[in-house]
UniProtKB/Swiss-Prot annotation:
Gene: bioD1
EC numbers: 6.3.3.3
Name the UniProt record assigns to this protein: ATP-dependent dethiobiotin synthetase BioD 1
Organism of derivation: Yersinia pestis
Functional summary from the UniProt entry: Catalyzes a mechanistically unusual reaction, the ATP-dependent insertion of CO2 between the N7 and N8 nitrogen atoms of 7,8-diaminopelargonic acid (DAPA, also called 7,8-diammoniononanoate) to form a ureido ring.
Taxonomic lineage of the native organism: Bacteria, Pseudomonadati, Pseudomonadota, Gammaproteobacteria, Enterobacterales
Enzyme class name: ligase
Assembly, per entry: Homodimer.
Pfam annotation, one family: AAA_26
């Protein structure tokens, strides 16, 4: 049976894609046939191959399965703004059924699929629906990425509470150090570990060379994470 995980963040720019690539690398190293799925992406560039989003390209590059770009990212928008605004501006609706259809198309070729959201948990996809609605519809276990910085504790606890109130499994969380280590960073992480009931999968350190060595090409991220706790969360979900 295909394992499916949804990656959300406590905010925009907290490192969801870095964490997603690390998870894909770790799962691939354990022998899984992996596929990254970024169903909706805004903030893209026009290339010779068409509109391309850097986050989606990173997921494509870190998937063990050979996937076409449109399989990884069926909804690509040019402007870097909330998907529901980009959707209205470009006149392209984002039906939840289409997101599910794209996911189903990946399942035959992969046994470990990582789905990366856009922005935070309640990011709107239309005036009526949010990403959270789709995740709840699909009953996906969730991995939360926390960008460790001032304010992250409140954002993380609110996001974790919303996920659990939706009746979904918060399978784990990743601490991503988005800035160089500050005076209180270790205390932020200790507080998060104590107050978030889900297990910590690992800490990704601040990557000072991310511009010169982007996640599209680097293969040194998977060792920061421990997937054994995900297997435990999966067993717990089955037994519920």
């Amino acid at each position: 049976m295909t394992k499916r995980w949804f990656i959300t963040g406590t905010d925009t720019d907290v490192g969801k894609t870095v964490a997603s690539c690390a998870l894909l690398q770790a799962a691939t190293a354990q022998g899984y046939r992996t596929a990254g799925y970024k169903p909706v992406a805004s903030g893209s560039q026009m290339t010779a191959d068409g509109l391309r989003n850097s986050d989606a390209l990173a997921l494509q590059a870190n998937s063990s399965q050979r996937l076409g770009y449109s399989q990884v990212n069926p909804f690509t928008f040019l402007e870097a703004t909330s998907p529901h605004i980009a959707s209205e501006s470009e006149g392209r609706a984002i039906p939840l059924t289409a997101l599910s259809q794209g996911l189903r198309q990946l399942e035959p070729s992969a046994d470990w699929i990582l789905i990366e959201g856009a922005g935070g948990w309640f990011t709107p996809l239309s005036p009526q629906a949010t990403f959270a609605d789709w995740v709840q519809q699909e009953q996906l276990p969730v991995i939360m990425v926390v960008g460790v910085k001032l304010g992250c504790i409140n954002h993380a606890l609110l996001t974790a509470q919303a996920i659990q109130h939706a009746g979904l499994t918060l399978a784990g969380w990743v601490a991503n150090e988005v800035t160089p280590a500050g005076r209180r960073q270790a205390e932020y992480q200790a507080t998060l570990t104590r107050m978030i009931t889900a297990p910590l999968l690992g800490i990704i350190p601040y990557l000072s060379d991310i511009e010169e060595n982007p996640v599209t090409t680097r293969r040194d991220l998977g060792h920061y994470l421990d997937l054994t706790v995900l297997r435990a969360a999966e067993r717990e979900a089955v037994n519920m």
